């Protein structure tokens, strides 16, 4: 066992090293919290002791990483993530090892208990102050009000009710009561209040009051409602000619949405989408984009996260620096496919067909790779289906049939519906039949009206499929299956006749009868069906 190979004293000594290396400050508190979440989610696996003072393990994060933990000299530890310093993955592995000898809380309280003490002092101070009300004309005032209301909500809400439901119906309701009257400001306030609730959800997660893994499905409906509020408010703002009076609000908005983007917890896709929507709709002014690029560039120099990467790339997208995006896209894993839909959607809405052509060429291998992932069929189908809604809009405008067919053929079987419809519309019946067979449809399971149309227009296209049915039923080797084989042979005879290939049919039926001459029951069914004469 691992406990027999590693000394408790070495582990405790390592804990002291970490306290020296990670002094109490907000950044290190957040680092410990992230490591604690990974540990609690059982993300650490395949732990092995290489020596009495060194262990290796894997950590399942957005992508799996490999950690080497040196208990003797912690700074000699390493991780395959791009962090370059003590990261959440190393700490998660350390917590796993530490838990074999001591209660994890004994180690983390150095940071977390002190944080609670500081928060308690602040809460007491605020409770004795006069309640803050927002100034309609100041974003800073809104944010201070959001903080004040959250402290009050925490103070008056029992511990057991400090959950997402309580946040949404208690805290958010309190914020809504003080929305500005001016329509433009009200819509912007609704965006910020929804983000405030989302951020406080993370506060509850970090405090251990919500479990991101266990509570995911109960949190999801509330996050969707917050996103709906943000999107509908953006749509309302789009109907106004945004006045310069909003500039002081918009100028400070990037700090808020960046805070949400960089949380690096659950709802990654949703946070990236909201970041992109707000930037595209409200913040695309060059000076704001340039300033945010500098901030994210500096942050990316300190650490790596998919949120940071896609945040940076979205700003490049707004400036049409597609080459910069494509350079990084070469390294995108297939899982990144859904994250490109926001960009495809924006270009589609702007009818930028020339730009889209290049984009579809670039994401083609990512889309093909996505269909090879080990995910439930429905999950892959939903993503590919969304891609094809966008692709269809492009193809309808450009008539780029070659591009459509490459995607449709390459993404089978998840594009069966789109590809089969396309082939039928183009009257490419033989291929239509073929893809039905590829995904496992028998003739009996295909659309009867379509088969009737094909039989009239291109009977030869159906012949291979009927041959497969005949072979299948003969292979069953029983009387009832021979009857079915004879039934399909009659239809096959009709198709050969319509295709004016009676001689081919005659040779085929003679060979079939001769090949299976020992199957008396089959011979009888062929005779009953008048497919062969009694002497065959």
Curated annotation (Swiss-Prot):
Alphabetically ordered keywords of this record: Coiled coil, Metal-binding, Zinc, Zinc-finger
InterPro entries in alphabetical order: Znf_SWIM
PROSITE patterns xrefs: ZF_SWIM
Chain ranges of zinc fingers (SWIM-type): 71-98
GO molecular function ontology, one term from the record: zinc ion binding
Coiled-coil regions listed: 482-528
Pfam families xrefs: SWIM
Protein name, as recorded: Uncharacterized protein YwqB
Species the sequence originates in: Bacillus subtilis (strain 168)
């Amino acid at each position: 066992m691992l406990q027999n190979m590693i000394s408790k004293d070495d582990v405790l000594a390592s804990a002291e090293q970490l306290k020296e290396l990670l002094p109490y400050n907000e950044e290190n508190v957040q680092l410990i919290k992230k490591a604690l979440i990974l540990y609690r989610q059982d993300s650490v696996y395949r732990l092995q002791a290489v020596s009495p003072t060194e262990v290796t393990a894997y950590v399942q994060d957005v992508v799996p990483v490999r950690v080497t933990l040196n208990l003797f000299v912690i700074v000699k530890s390493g991780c395959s993530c791009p962090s370059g310093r003590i990261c959440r993955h190393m700490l998660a592995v350390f917590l796993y090892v530490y838990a074999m000898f001591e209660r994890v809380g004994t180690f983390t309280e150095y940071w977390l208990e002190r944080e609670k003490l500081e928060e308690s002092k602040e809460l007491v101070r605020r409770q004795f102050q006069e309640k803050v009300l927002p100034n309609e004309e100041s974003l800073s005032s809104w944010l201070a009000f959001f903080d004040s209301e959250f402290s009050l909500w925490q103070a008056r809400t029992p511990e057991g009710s400090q959950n997402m439901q309580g946040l949404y119906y208690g805290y958010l309701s309190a914020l809504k009561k003080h929305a500005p009257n001016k329509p433009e400001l009200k819509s912007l306030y609704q965006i910020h209040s929804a983000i405030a609730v989302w951020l406080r959800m993370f506060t509850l997660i970090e405090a251990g009051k919500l479990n991101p893994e266990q509570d995911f499905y109960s949190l999801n409906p509330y996050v969707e409602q917050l996103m709906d509020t943000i999107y509908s408010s953006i749509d309302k703002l789009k109907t106004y000619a945004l006045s310069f009076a909003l500039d002081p609000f918009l100028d400070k908005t990037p700090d808020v949405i960046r805070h949400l983007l960089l949380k690096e917890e659950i709802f990654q896709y949703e946070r990236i989408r909201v970041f992109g929507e707000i930037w595209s709709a409200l913040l695309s002014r060059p000076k704001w984009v340039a300033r945010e690029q500098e901030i994210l560039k500096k942050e990316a120099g300190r650490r790596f996260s998919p949120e940071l990467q896609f945040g940076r790339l979205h700003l490049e997208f707004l400036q049409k620096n597609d080459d910069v995006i494509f350079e990084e896209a070469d390294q995108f894993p297939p899982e990144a496919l859904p994250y490109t839909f926001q960009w495809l959607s924006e270009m589609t809405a702007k009818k930028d067909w020339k730009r889209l052509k290049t984009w579809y060429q670039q994401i083609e291998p990512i889309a093909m790779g996505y269909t090879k992932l080990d995910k439930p069929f429905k999950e892959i189908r939903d993503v590919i289906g969304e891609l094809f809604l966008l692709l269809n809009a492009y193809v309808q405008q450009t008539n780029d049939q070659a591009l459509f067919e490459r995607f449709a053929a390459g993404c089978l079987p998840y594009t069966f519906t789109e590809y089969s419809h396309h082939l039928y519309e183009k009257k490419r019946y033989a291929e239509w039949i073929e893809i039905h067979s590829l995904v496992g449809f028998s003739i009996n399971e295909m659309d009867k009206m379509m088969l009737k149309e094909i039989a009239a227009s291109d009977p030869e296209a159906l012949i291979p499929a009927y041959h497969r049915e005949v072979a299948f039923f003969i292979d069953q080797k029983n009387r009832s299956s021979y009857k079915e084989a004879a039934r399909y042979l009659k239809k096959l005879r009709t198709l050969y006749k319509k295709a004016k290939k009676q001689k081919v049919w005659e040779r085929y039926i003679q060979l079939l009868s001769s090949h299976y001459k020992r199957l008396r029951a089959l011979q009888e069914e062929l005779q009953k069906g008048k497919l062969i004469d009694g002497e065959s």
